[in-house]
């Protein structure tokens, strides 16, 4: 990110989308039980995204930093029986990489960054 931040800020356009997981939430359903190392690593990713977004002005410098939960997708990790295809799991990441952003936007969705997203919605963590 250090290498990419300056050119993205200069161009006033850029998106950093980091894959995480809803299992890294600190609140909400399914936030306890099993997979502790995985959960803790994803909680760390979510915290990193939040902090990087704040350090870069929450979009005011021209680029966004967000985390995405791709859900249980058919990948090497998700396995062949996962309910979503890899393409379906990637839809929110693609949306984040291409979405419009307005720091002064009229809706909350227009000006959110530094959060965890799932199915194009913010996931409280």
Q: What would you call each of these model-derived segments?
A:
Residues 2-59, 69, 82:
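Catalytic loop of short-chain dehydrogenase/reductase
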Residues 59-63, 67-68, 75, 79-125:
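C-terminal helical subdomain
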């Amino acid at each position: 990110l250090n290498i990419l931040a300056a050119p993205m800020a200069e161009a006033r356009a850029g998106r950093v989308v980091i894959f995480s997981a809803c299992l890294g939430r600190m609140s909400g359903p399914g936030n306890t039980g099993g997979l502790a190392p995985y959960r803790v690593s994803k909680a760390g990713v979510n915290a990193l995204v939040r902090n990087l977004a704040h350090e870069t002005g929450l979009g005011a410098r021209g680029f966004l930093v967000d985390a995405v939960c791709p859900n249980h997708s058919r990948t090497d990790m998700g396995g062949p029986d996962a309910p979503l295809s890899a393409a379906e799991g990637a839809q929110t990441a693609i949306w984040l990489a291409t979405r419009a952003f307005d720091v002064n936007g009229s809706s909350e969705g227009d000006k959110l960054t530094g959060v965890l997203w799932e199915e194009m919605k913010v996931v409280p963590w």
